[in-house]
Amino acid sequence: MLKKNTEAAATPVASEVIDVDFCVIGAGSGGLSFAAAAAAFGQKVVLIEKHKMGGDCLNYGCVPSKALLAAGKRAHYMRTSAKFGIVPVEPIVDAKAVHGHVQDVIASIAPNDSVERFTGLGVRVITAAGRFIDKKTVEAGGHRITARRFIIATGSSPVVPPDRKSVV
């Protein structure tokens, strides 16, 4: 989570100052896309991620949900195959194997979002939480990063507003 430092006097001294064209905070879909494109154009880029490369999409959201949907679709086809002249059967779901499938799909995509790949593209990756210490400086992992531009790509959280009938 990105938070503004309100206790400047308590800020520890960082070990290294890194000056770049772009500092990208968040290594989900948006942050990774921007970092790769900027590096491809020869820009100096630092990418800060406090948790997992690939963000929620790769690790918890888009990719795992699509892998689960694919498994469910196969089960549905087994149940509804009569219209194609195939005797339908009730599938036996092995939850552990489905979970393994989901993990395999994540693992097959993860190298595209990895620290190693982005380092190879010329992006400096810092695995730590980032926080602004002033309007032109972010601190992360013992480093102070100054940049021409900051890209905040930390994602979002869904909010379900109360409708006073079914959600309070």
Whereabouts are the PLM-identified features?
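Glycine-rich flavin
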Residues: 1-20, 29, 36-43, 48-168
